[in-house]
Each structure stands twice: as C-alpha cells, then as structure tokens.
Amino acid sequence: MDSLRLGTYTFSSRLILGTGKFSSTSAMIKAVRASGTQLVTVALRRFNREQAEDDLFGPLSEIEGLTLMPNTSGAATAKEAIKAAHIARELSGSPFIKVEIHPNPHHLMPDPIETWEACKILAAEGFIVMPYIPADPVLAKRLEEVGCSSVMPLGSAIGSGQGLSTAEMVKIIIRESSVPVIVDAGLRSPSEACAAMEMGCEAVLVNSAVAVARDPAAMALAFAKAVEAGFEARNAGLMPRSGSAVATSPLTSFLGATR
C-alpha cells in the first residue's frame, strides 16, 4: 500500500487510532499493536508521567515506529487550543497537533470559526496541523489555504456510531482538496472505514468503535484490513454503477447458433 504523507512524515498504515475510552491501558496498547497503526492521537491530559495509571505517553513511547499526535480535546476556544498545543509539543516532542474545539458538551460539534483561528496560528508556528471539522467543503478549503496538512471531516457525531452520514459532503471535500482528507468520528464498523477509503479518503481515524468492542485488539485488526481493502479497491478501479442490469455472460449468439 502506498505511503500516507502528512507534512514531512510518511506512514505505511492509513489507519489512525484514538486512545480514549479503553477499559485499561493494557487493552489500548494491545489494540494499537494489533492495528499496525503508526499514528495515534492522545489527549493532553493523558500526558502525565507523575501518575502512571493516567499516563499514556510512557506506554505508547515503547512501541517502535509509533508517532504521537496530541489533540486539544477539551478546548472551547482557539486560545485554549493554542495553549494546549504548545504544552503538548513541549511534553511529547511531536510536531503533530490534532485541533479539536467543541465547546458544546451535548453534541460535541467542532466550532468552525475557533478552529480556523487556531489552525492559522499553529500552522504558522510550524505544527503539522490536522483539524477535526464539520463536513464543510468551504471550511476545509480555507483550512488548507492557511497551511493545514490535512482536513478531518466528521463522518457523524463523535462516539455516535452513526457511520458516514456526511458522505456526500465528504466527497465534495475530497474532490476539492489538495491535502489528505481523513474521516474522523462516528464510524462504527470496518465496512464503513472501507467505504470511506473507496470514496477517496486518504486515511480514517477510529476510536470508540475499537475501544468499546468486546475484543478491541481483534476489532482494531479488522479495521486495519478494511482500510487496506478500501484503498486497494479504489486503486484497482471500482466498476461504474448502472441504472439497469447488465448481463455478465450474454447467451444470444450461442442460442442462435444451436437453433
């Protein structure tokens, strides 16, 4: 599978994994290893080396070839997100930052105005900026223009498991973007991840669907296989849709010859 390029980094895996909601750090680490992912996102509050039970930085740092992408989850404004990004870079040493600004805890929809403000500043400061956004083609283009390394439109609401309810808007974003489009949030099943890749996404980010599965490691592996299958299918060339049936083995000439 071709490499995913984000900023100056390349990744052979196109599955990005979130690290929240797992029943234990051990379960999360097993899922990360099973998935083969090379990029995981971690909330700033989980960088806590003084309290081992809350710290994810240490265990994740032990996985060879894994890059950490801190996120600004919990930020309600651009100012808070920028502050969180600075702290995260100092603690992790990672140039990546996933900008998440969702001020309303009831629906967790990303704030487009505050997100744009934060991304403009962080990109200028040299971060590899990956914003979580509504499936808005205009916003996605504006974020690309200020220097974001990718755009991450939601498939549906965070943790909802409602799948690719924004598929038509995501398709427009893909057509108009010059940076990788990565579906983030709402995916429930590996088949939805496969569909996202088939439609043209460069990667998918999954968290809840893996974390709350009966067997997170097995589900992580299933998502990894689905992402690869979707990417390979797209490159192979999906057959066009037809409004009517098209016979695969026409028998007209054969039947005529036997009369």
From Swiss-Prot:
Indicate yes or no for the key word Cytoplasm. Answer: yes
Q: Which domain of life is it from?
A: Bacteria
A cellular component term, taken from the record's GO annotations: cytoplasm
GO MF annotations in UniProt: thiazole synthase activity
Where in or outside the cell is it found?
Cytoplasm
Q: What is its main location?
A: cytoplasm
Positions annotated as active site in the UniProt record: K98
* Catalytic reactions on record: [ThiS sulfur-carrier protein]-C-terminal-Gly-aminoethanethioate + 2-iminoacetate + 1-deoxy-D-xylulose 5-phosphate = [ThiS sulfur-carrier protein]-C-terminal Gly-Gly + 2-[(2R,5Z)-2-carboxy-4-methylthiazol-5(2H)-ylidene]ethyl phosphate + 2 H2O + H(+)
Record-linked InterPro entries: Aldolase_TIM, Thiazole_synthase_ThiG, ThiG
Where along this sequence does the record place binding of 1-deoxy-D-xylulose 5-phosphate?
A: G159, A185, G186, N207, S208
Task: Tell me its EC number(s), please.
Answer: 2.8.1.10
GO BP terms in the entry:
thiamine diphosphate biosynthetic process
User: Could you tell me which pathway this protein works in?
Assistant: Cofactor biosynthesis; thiamine diphosphate biosynthesis
Q: Which CDD domains match?
A: ThiG
Keywords in alphabetical order, please: Cytoplasm, Schiff base, Thiamine biosynthesis, Transferase
Quaternary structure (record): Homotetramer. Forms heterodimers with either ThiH or ThiS.
What family does the database annotate? Belongs to the ThiG family.
Function summary = Catalyzes the rearrangement of 1-deoxy-D-xylulose 5-phosphate (DXP) to produce the thiazole phosphate moiety of thiamine. Sulfur is provided by the thiocarboxylate moiety of the carrier protein ThiS. In vitro, sulfur can be provided by H(2)S.
PANTHER family cross-referenced by the UniProt entry: THIAZOLE SYNTHASE (PTHR34266:SF2)
Protein name per Swiss-Prot or TrEMBL: Thiazole synthase
Give the species.
Chlorobaculum tepidum (strain ATCC 49652 / DSM 12025 / NBRC 103806 / TLS) (Chlorobium tepidum)
Source species taxonomy: Bacteria, Pseudomonadati, Chlorobiota, Chlorobiia, Chlorobiales
Tell me the name of the encoding gene.
thiG
